[in-house]
Design a protein with these regions (language model features):
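Extended, subdomain-level signal for the structured scaffold at the beginning of enzyme domains
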Residues: 1-99, 103, 112-118, 123, ...
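Catalytic nucleophile serine of serine hydrolases
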Residues: 107
Length: 193
């Protein structure tokens, strides 16, 4: 069964930070689902103006970390700023983290990780204007394309998308291999009659 990635976004996401990683994840064989507290469609930000509407697959009320293998949080200034005020979003992020499932956050999306209180003592990156916020929340901030600390995969900006998406793909493939190894171990323990 293909690994499933939940994407959380609302109006004002950076269009490339949702569409490009989604395309790369799907090309690698993973299923994606876009959830939002905003029903119907949401609009991203593209080249200084509103982008095209994107269809929302599920309402945030209808998703659970139990149903997905990873979480993708696109940035943009408005999107994470709106989402971090929604307790349902923060609870979902906390659930992914407590289950040690990969969480990818790019650009301003690490604001959501701060709100979920999961960056203290961890190495992360993000858009330069939120570095102080991350440091004040106890994170060690690095200025590099991708920072990986346990299940957290963070990135700075749209130019980093290829490396960011690949890190998320690698984490999902590693989880698939672990699942296969666990299944083989269970099969080895079955006695034949």
């Amino acid at each position: 069964m293909a690994k499933r990635v939940l994407i959380l976004a609302t109006d004002g996401f950076e269009q490339s930070e949702l569409l490009e990683p989604r395309k790369l994840l799907e090309a690698a064989g993973f299923e994606t689902t876009l959830a939002s507290p905003t029903p119907g469609t949401i609009r991203g930000w593209h080249d200084g103006d509103w982008g095209k509407p994107i269809k929302v697959d599920k309402d945030i009320e209808d998703v659970s970390a139990d149903d997905f293998d990873a979480l993708l949080l696109p940035g943009g200034q408005m999107n994470p700023d709106i989402l971090r005020m929604d307790d349902r979003v923060i609870e979902l992020i906390e659930d992914f983290d407590s289950e040690n499932k990969p969480i990818g956050a790019i650009c301003h999306a690490p604001w959501l990780l701060i709100e979920a209180d999961i960056v203290d003592g961890r190495t992360v990156t993000g858009w330069p204007s939120i570095h102080t916020d991350l440091e004040n929340a106890g994170a060690e901030v690095v200025d590099q394309a991708v920072a990986i600390d346990g299940n957290l995969i963070t990135s700075r900006k749209p130019e980093d998308i290829p490396a960011f998406a690949q890190a998320l793909i690698d984490a999902l493939e590693e989880a698939e291999e672990e699942d296969e190894d666990d299944a083989e171990e269970e099969d080895d323990g079955i006695e034949e009659l």
